């Protein structure tokens, strides 16, 4: 387990399942994550993801990207600006550039958690999707299916709570006897740290944070790494793989999801007015030059 400092006990969380979010939601809660009426681009992104995201593929990608490229040096704000031209094709709730979503998430968190002791939480909201830079020309425009969308464990049976579950039937791992039992290649309650997740922006940016020795607390790293793992934090699935540490962090991941999902708005954000605050947090938690 990667050691990081923890700044706030999980008992301090104000998680509220009633969805009294503390910030304005621009549409009905039931209208979010509506995949039945989503555009064709959304189902196509998941068709490709569920077909091509195999255990071997994800293992190879993690090995490739964990060796950070020292020739790519870029600050977090510069990375965020790369998202100006990127649309997440797997997202039925947003068709605006990703930098707007990042700042909408961060500002919603900041409204509910204004105290400076939660500044790490504000920053997490801003940076959580920066792994989507993989879609940019700077990173050779990696395919959407290998970058965005809900994440899921590989090396074990696909759970039916996964969105567009039927597409997994085209995945080579679906009928592989090594992988199609409940635990597959893993021991029960092995812990998510030891589970190979589908490859994408979550896992990639987690590797960037850890590889650059950022100063974010453990709660933040869990949010970054598992915010797209909806079968776990929304449907309480795959608990046969989680351990005590994962369960301690689950409420934080759920709390983050409230802001990540329900703060989405088609109205653009005044990026320049917010830039000084988030740059100050970047300097605090990412003091070193960043490699990607």
Swiss-Prot record:
Keywords: Cytoplasm, Iron, Metal-binding, Oxidoreductase. This is Inositol oxygenase. PANTHER family: INOSITOL OXYGENASE, MYOINOSITOL OXYGENASE. Binds 2 iron ions per subunit. It comes from Dictyostelium discoideum. GO terms for biological process: inositol catabolic process. Substrate binds at residues 33, 88-90, 132, 149-150, 227-228. Its cofactor is Fe cation. Fe cation 1 binds at residues 101, 128-129, 260. The keyword Translocase does not apply. It is found in: Cytoplasm. Belongs to the myo-inositol oxygenase family. Pathway: Polyol metabolism; myo-inositol degradation into D-glucuronate; D-glucuronate from myo-inositol: step 1/1. One of its GO terms (molecular function) is oxidoreductase activity, acting on single donors with incorporation of molecular oxygen. InterPro entries: Inositol_oxygenase. Coiled coil: none annotated. Fe cation 2 binds at residues 129, 201, 227. Pfam families: MIOX. Its EC number is 1.13.99.1. It comes from the Eukaryota.
């Amino acid at each position: 387990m990667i050691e990081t400092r923890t700044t706030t006990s999980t008992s301090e969380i104000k998680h509220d399942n009633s969805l009294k979010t503390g910030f304005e939601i621009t549409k009905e809660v039931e209208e979010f994550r509506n995949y039945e009426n989503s555009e064709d681009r959304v189902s196509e992104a998941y068709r490709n993801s569920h077909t091509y995201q195999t255990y071997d593929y994800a293992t190879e990608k993690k090995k490739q990207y964990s060796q950070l490229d020292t020739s790519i040096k870029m600050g977090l704000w510069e990375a965020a600006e790369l998202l100006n031209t990127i649309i997440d094709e797997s997202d039925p709730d947003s068709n605006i550039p990703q930098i707007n979503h990042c700042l909408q998430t961060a500002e919603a968190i900041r409204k509910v958690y204004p105290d400076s002791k939660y500044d790490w939480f504000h920053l997490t909201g801003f940076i959580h999707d920066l792994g989507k830079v993989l879609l940019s020309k700077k990173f050779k425009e990696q395919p959407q299916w290998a970058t965005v969308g809900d994440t899921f464990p590989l090396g074990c049976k696909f759970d039916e709570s996964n969105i567009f579950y039927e597409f997994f039937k085209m995945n080579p791992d679906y009928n592989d006897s090594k992988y199609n039992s409940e635990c597959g290649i893993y021991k029960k309650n092995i812990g998510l740290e030891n589970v190979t997740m589908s490859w994408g922006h979550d896992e990639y940016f987690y590797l960037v944070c850890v590889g650059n020795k950022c100063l974010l607390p453990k709660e933040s790293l869990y949010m970054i790494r598992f915010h797209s793992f909806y079968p776990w934090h929304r449907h309480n699935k795959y608990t046969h793989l989680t351990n005590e540490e994962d369960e301690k962090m689950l409420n934080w991941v759920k709390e983050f999801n409230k802001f990540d999902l329900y703060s989405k708005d088609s109205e653009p954000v005044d990026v320049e007015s917010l830039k000084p605050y988030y740059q100050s947090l970047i300097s605090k938690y990412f003091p070193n030059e960043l490699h990607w």
